[in-house]
Structures are given as structure tokens and as C-alpha cells.
């Protein structure tokens, strides 16, 4: 493993921030599956061949599954807390045989990229901009997300440290 992989393994808090962002704003807001046989789901009869839609948007904000579900709290995904999350309560990359094969890679890549950005810049949402999520193929902010980037003075800060996201270890 090279330096990038070693840093990625230590970016626990950065990954927690990304995962919490994906909980509130899942890349794909819903997924569908076809029932391979008859079943009962929450007291409703599902016939073979029926299309069942699971909304990650609703699932990730469900009050029975998440404490303060509308609050951004990356601590949910830190070691010690993450293990308490029901395995079917958090599905940003889907689940089962059709789970996104790039899930692990994309999370690692996002953590490395975010750490490098935060090491060099501070980011601020443009004043008075309200981010409105819209579903296309993926969930995204309508009209983009206009940000103000400011170069940080100390270019040698540890990845993520200036943003309050510190590598563990």
C-alpha cells in the first residue's frame, strides 16, 4: 500500500462526514426490485413479479431507525457508533446482489479528495443560496452548489485537520 492508501485508512472522521452526507442526501434516492415470489411486507401482501420501491431518502431519515434523523451528525459513523446502525437502515449504494461494486473505492477516493481540498482551502456556501435536492438519475442540488473557496495559509496542514476532520492514529 502506498501513501494515499495509508492516509485513507486514517481518515476515519472524513469518511464519517461523507457517510453522514450520503445518509441525508443519498446518491440514488430510491431503488426498485421485482419480487421473485409472494411475500408479506409490513402487513401488505406482495405478489410475485410486483415492483417494490425502497426510498433511501425516507429510510435514511426514518425516526424509528435514526436518532434525530434530520440532523447532520457524522459521529453516527465513527467506530463504536457505526456498529449500532441496522444493516438495512443505511443503503446509499444499494444492497444485495446489485449493490454498487464501486462503493468501497468511491468512499476511499472521496475521503482522499476531500482531505486534499480541505487541506488547501476553506469552503463556504455562497450567501443566500439554498440547496434544493432534485432527483435525476442521481440526487443532486438543483442548479449546482455555488461555493466560495479560500486558500488556507498553511499548506502543510495534515489532510482534513484545518477543517476539524482529523486523521486518527
Residue ranges and their predicted role:
Residues 14, 20-23, 30, 143-169:
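C-terminal domain-closing interface element
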Residues 54-82, 158, 164:
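Conserved cytochrome P450 K-helix/beta-meander segment immediately N-terminal to the heme-binding cysteine loop
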Residues 81-90:
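Active-site-adjacent bridging/hinge elements
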Amino acid at each position: 500500500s502506498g501513501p494515499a492508501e495509508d492516509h485513507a485508512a486514517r481518515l476515519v472522521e472524513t469518511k464519517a462526514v461523507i457517510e453522514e452526507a450520503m445518509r441525508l442526501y443519498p446518491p440514488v434516492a430510491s431503488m426498485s426490485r421485482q419480487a421473485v415470489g409472494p411475500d408479506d411486507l409490513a402487513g401488505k401482501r406482495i405478489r410475485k413479479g410486483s415492483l417494490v420501491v425502497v426510498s433511501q431518502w425516507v429510510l435514511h431519515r426514518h425516526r424509528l431507525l435514526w436518532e434525530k434523523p434530520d440532523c447532520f451528525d457524522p459521529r453516527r459513523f465513527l467506530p463504536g457508533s457505526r456498529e449500532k446502525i441496522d444493516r438495512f437502515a443505511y443503503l446509499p449504494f444499494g444492497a444485495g446482489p446489485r449493490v454498487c461494486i464501486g462503493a468501497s473505492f468511491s468512499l476511499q477516493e472521496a475521503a482522499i479528495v476531500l482531505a486534499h481540498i480541505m487541506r488547501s482551502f476553506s469552503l463556504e456556501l455562497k450567501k443566500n443560496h439554498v440547496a434544493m435536492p432534485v432527483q435525476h438519475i442521481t440526487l443532486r442540488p438543483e442548479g449546482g452548489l455555488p461555493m466560495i473557496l479560500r486558500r488556507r495559509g498553511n499548506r502543510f496542514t495534515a489532510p482534513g485537520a484545518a477543517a476539524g476532520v482529523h486523521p486518527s492514529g
